Amino acid sequence: MSRKFLLVGNSHLACVKVAMDIEPGLLGGRTVDYVAFNQIDAADFDVVEGIIKPPTNTSAIPADARLGEARATDYSGFVIVGMGLSINLLASIYLSHRLLAHHRQGLHLLSRAAFDSAVAESIQKLGVNSIIAKLRAATNVPVLLVPEPLMNAEIAKDERGADVWTGEHTPFLVERYISSLHQVFDPVVDLLEQPPETIDGVFTRAEYAYGGLRSLTKRDKRGNPWRYKEDHRDYRHMNEQYGAIICRRIENWLTSRGL
């Protein structure tokens, strides 16, 4: 079997791809294909008679991140990046509901059992589960899941997010997020936790978000990767420095798997 790998993702794949464009030796020089599309289209990803069929919404797929007639068995492993696996799944619950220990006036009270059930359901509803199932039905090679990074630390300074992203409940949300990912995905795929050197408390270190990337192909007027300015209020997307760290962790995973 050839040593070729497919990276599947949404906008969070951009920092990884740009890092590899800058430093081609990342992943140990292994051959890599990419396919990118919006997470809302993930349920349309399919494998038909062994051929990988990305969503047909081509406007969501950058020109250099489309596949031709690629067979699932052409690849020695798959890496799935982002695709809605985010701490925001839990934060969205805490916008209106809280456990008793974190409760305040104006919010609905939620039991621990109901909270855990809501978290598990929100993860299981994501289209990434369909991608995994369809790849697994076509091949048994290893699959690595790379969730979205924690929020940029600068979000704690933004009054719009202060209620959810500051307070004694925030470490609890992060702990439950990570443990819930393991509970759902450990039986079926490998999971890459966020590298600790990129974490500042319960957030991603702000330095990795400056100039965050969302597009695999979009360029500025100088031909450089298009990125957000440092003061842009997108707290979820990271830059190529973060992408390079993730690439090295992916390479470690590939090596540990003998790939």
Residue positions per predicted region:
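Charged, often glycine-rich, active-site loop that binds/positions anionic groups
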Residues: 47-54, 158-161, 203-219
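Conserved aromatic-histidine-acidic binding/catalytic patches
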Residues: 4, 8, 116-123, 165, ...
